[in-house]
């Protein structure tokens, strides 16, 4: 087995060259050149951090947990230390696969039949349909997608942070140390495999662009910053983009040239932001359309702050209950134990709690900057780093102020620690410049170093942390004698600190457990049938949602914070399936409910520990024990004509679904139907002429004798309702209603023999128009504007 997978490495080098060209162009657009040292170190960072995975013997995927999640996998020894990263297997990779399937079919991923009863990957930011880095990583097989994507994130984040530090006047060595601290620290590695870090990698670039706009605004800088803004907004995590925008605004305001005038810089930044939003509008507008009705919005808008007693003498009481420990994250690599190795003793989980750690070198530099550097340019970074900690820890005076505005309850404020870690690294560069200078260090600098070490060791005084501080102190002493050697010594301390620490966040998955296709899965997929018409599911927690989509089976169960709340209420009433933001996983129960027939579920995964069903039939003959394969004998196709139609109010949906006895008897909402009532009676089901995700053409048979021939009928479907669905027949649009409170229904007039259903993400057309206008304006800026004036550089730095 070779030490390095040559094919993987060559492909990675080619894709990184393309991304490097983009970074070079962005830097030129901002009036800078990327130094050779920044380019070389930006390439070395992913190679150093990811070498164990480049051989291809282990996957950068936590797939070992599938040993118990997929029936029929041969037993082997695996580690479950990375099971907290289960969203990678149940959300991120299934969404990515659906995007790849759509692109392979030469269609845009507007809709997926397999995911969550039907959903739109386009409107889901974390699917990363238009994420620049995810698009580049699609050159790799799906099992290496996360590895390639992380390498690209490291490249972009490193060079962007170097550029930001240089724009603040930092020296070459301290800028490289700041870039290494951010790209190898918790700001990137705590959530290394998630879309959130694809967004945060662009934050230093945005901050650099905004600083340039406040200092020397020009057309090319505006266009370049707009492109960076669009890349950030398209990268899969809107709340991180919002926090990154706040950080960039703080940088621009704090580092502006007073002679340039606030109004001019603010105006240029506003124009760049508007153009960036316009470029990203084809994705942003559909996302904003679905957010208000999502599970995430409903759960977070109702959350409250803790009511524990407050005491001035007890600092943990200054924060919301359970959040105070977030303030410790920058202080030690082992503030909550060794990541994924020791028992966890921090807030919530490893990824959330460790986000704020940027290394002891950055911490020491930040304390030196705080106490000994009299440079106003350091203030925005120091202030933002502190504020990000207070937001993540829910400092009660600040939290109560935010909670007065309901929409401000929605963001996960722990994500603010990512730009906070970036701020800490750049602030640390100010202190490192002083430590690496030939000037005599003031006493305040030594006090800053001592204070940083004391606080860090008060949090965790293990042998490794003590050794790191001893080496850091020795590096500072070397820097007093030979600054260049001191810089190299600090780099060695940083790598010794962060490389093993960052690698501890990365799973080493067994390739044989990457979505294994077992005989049970093969039999299940055959029984479930065509995903355009039929579905499968797992009883209780079996074959958890989105897992089946990887094997080509449509599943009605959502596992997505953007799932429509109305759909989840229907599933709760029928099956007790009620995932929330606090209770993330939920079982499916009561599989004898008629809604299972309505949803077109043909195959169900069961086990000997699941309560027996009265309606489902075991068809496996016991050959998959302890698992069972169950058949539903009476599923309805995805579209049908109901036997009877009830009219109910919107507030009666859950009660009606809970009392449902016949899948062919459906309900429509009185608020939508008004006085209209469809003709009833049996009718043959429509025949699909085309059944592509998001586009269905049905041949409508003549109404049966008892179906009220000549009257309007209701075409019922089990497609999850969304604003983007439309219907046409005979050259005219048809009204689309909700059936059973959460599914698409069509008011079908008498006469048409064909009906067409199509999904277009709501806001997509308007977004495309906005993108076209913004793109034209950006091109005009690039063609008409002069090259950005280069920022002044100091010799010898």
Segments the model singles out, each with a brief description of its role:
Residues 1-32, 195, 201, 213-230, ...:
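Contiguous transmembrane helix-bundle modules in multi-pass membrane proteins
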Residues 2, 66-103, 107-109, 278-371, ...:
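Periplasmic/ER-lumenal interhelical loops and adjacent helix-loop junctions
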Residues 42, 158-168, 172-257, 268-287, ...:
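Membrane-embedded helix bundles of polyisoprenyl
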Residues 47-57, 103, 136-144, 173-194, ...:
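Membrane-interface helix-loop junctions at the exits of transmembrane helices
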Residues 68-69, 297-306, 463, 498-684:
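Extracytoplasmic
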Residues 95-102, 112-141, 326, 331-341, ...:
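Short hydrophobic/aromatic helix or loop-helix immediately within or flanking a transmembrane segment
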Residues 117, 127-131, 135-159, 192-198, ...:
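Loop-to-helix entry region of an early transmembrane alpha helix in multi-pass inner-membrane enzymes
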Residues 602, 625, 663-793:
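Active-site-proximal, structured, solvent-exposed surfaces of multi-pass membrane proteins
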């Amino acid at each position: 087995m070779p030490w390095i997978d040559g094919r993987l490495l060559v492909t990675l080098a080619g894709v990184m060259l393309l991304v490097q060209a983009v970074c070079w162009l962005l830097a030129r657009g901002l009036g800078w050149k990327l130094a050779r040292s920044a380019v070389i170190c930006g390439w070395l960072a992913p190679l150093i951090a990811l070498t164990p995975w480049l051989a291809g013997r282990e996957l950068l995927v936590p797939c070992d947990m599938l040993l118990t999640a997929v029936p029929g996998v041969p037993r082997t020894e695996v580690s479950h230390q990375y099971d907290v990263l289960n969203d990678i297997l149940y959300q991120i990779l299934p969404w990515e696969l659906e995007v790849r399937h759509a692109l392979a079919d030469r269609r845009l991923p507007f809709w997926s039949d397999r995911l969550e009863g039907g959903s739109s990957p386009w409107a889901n930011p974390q699917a990363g349909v238009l994420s620049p880095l995810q698009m580049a990583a699609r050159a790799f097989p799906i099992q290496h997608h996360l590895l390639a994507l992380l390498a690209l994130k490291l490249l972009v984040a490193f060079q962007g942070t170097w550029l930001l530090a240089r724009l603040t006047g930092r020296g070459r060595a301290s800028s490289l140390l700041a870039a290494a601290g951010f790209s190898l620290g918790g700001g990137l590695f705590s959530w290394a495999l998630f879309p959130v870090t694809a967004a945060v990698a662009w934050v230093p670039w945005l901050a650099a662009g905004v600083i340039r706009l406040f200092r020397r605004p020009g057309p090319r800088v505006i266009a370049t910053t707009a492109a960076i803004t669009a890349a950030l907004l398209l990268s899969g995590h809107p709340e991180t983009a919002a926090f990154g925008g706040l950080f960039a605004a703080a940088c621009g305001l704090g580092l502006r040239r007073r002679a340039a005038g606030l109004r001019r810089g603010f105006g240029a930044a506003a124009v760049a932001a508007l153009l960036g939003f316009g470029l990203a509008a084809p994705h942003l507008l559909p996302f904003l359309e679905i957010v208000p009705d999502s599970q995430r919005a409903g759960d977070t808008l109702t959350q409250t702050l803790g009511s524990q007693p407050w005491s001035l003498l007890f600092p943990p009481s200054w924060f919301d209950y359970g959040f105070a420990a977030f303030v410790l994250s920058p202080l030690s690599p082992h503030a909550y134990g060794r990541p994924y190795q020791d028992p966890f003793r921090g807030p919530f989980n490893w990824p959330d709690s460790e986000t704020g750690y940027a290394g002891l070198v950055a911490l020491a530099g930040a304390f030196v900057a705080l106490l000994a550097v009299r440079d106003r340019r350091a203030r925005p970074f120091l202030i933002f780093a502190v504020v990000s900690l207070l937001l993540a820890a829910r400092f009660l005076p600040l939290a109560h102020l935010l909670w007065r505005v309901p929409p401000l309850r929605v963001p996960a404020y722990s994500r603010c620690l990512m730009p906070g870690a970036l701020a800490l690294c750049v602030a640390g560069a100010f202190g490192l410049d002083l430590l690496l200078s030939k000037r005599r260090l003031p006493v305040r600098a030594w006090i800053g170093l001592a204070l940083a070490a004391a606080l860090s060791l008060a949090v965790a005084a293990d042998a490794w942390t003590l050794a790191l501080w001893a080496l850091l102190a020795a590096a500072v002493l070397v820097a007093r004698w030979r600054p260049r050697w001191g810089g190299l010594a600090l780099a060695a301390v940083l790598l010794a600190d962060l490389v093993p620490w960052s690698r501890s966040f990365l799973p080493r998955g067994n390739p044989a457990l990457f979505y294994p296709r077992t005989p049970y899965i093969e039999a299940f997929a055959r029984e479930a049938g065509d995903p355009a018409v039929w579905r499968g599911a797992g009883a209780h927690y079996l074959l958890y949602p989105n897992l089946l989509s990887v094997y080509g089976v449509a599943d009605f169960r959502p596992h997505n914070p953007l799932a429509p709340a109305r759909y989840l209420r229907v599933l709760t009433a029928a099956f007790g399936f009620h995932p929330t933001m606090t209770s993330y996983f939920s079982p499916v129960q009561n599989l004898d409910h008629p809604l299972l027939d309505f949803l077109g579920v043909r195959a169900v995964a069961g086990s000997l520990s699941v309560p027996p069903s009265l309606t489902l039939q075991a068809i496996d003959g016991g050959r998959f024990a302890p698992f069972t394969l169950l058949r539903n004998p009476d599923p309805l196709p995805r579209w049908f004509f109901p036997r009877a139609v009830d009219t109910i109010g919107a507030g009666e949906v859950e009660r009606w679904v809970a009392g449902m006895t016949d899948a062919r008897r459906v309900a429509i909402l009185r608020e939508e139907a008004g006085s209209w009532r469809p003709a009833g009676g049996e009718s043959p089901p429509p025949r699909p002429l085309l059944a592509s995700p998001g586009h269905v053409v049905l041949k409508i048979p003549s109404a049966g004798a008892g179906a009220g021939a000549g009257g309007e009928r209701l075409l019922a479907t089990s497609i999850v309702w969304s604003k983007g669905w439309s219907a046409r027949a005979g050259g005219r649009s048809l009204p689309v209603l909700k059936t059973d409170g959460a599914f698409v229904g069509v008011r079908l007039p008498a006469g048409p023999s064909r009906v067409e259903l199509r999904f277009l993400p709501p806001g997509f057309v308007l977004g495309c128009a906005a993108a076209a206008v913004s793109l034209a304006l950006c091109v005009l800026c690039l063609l008409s504007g002069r090259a950005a004036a280069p920022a002044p550089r100091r010799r010898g730095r």
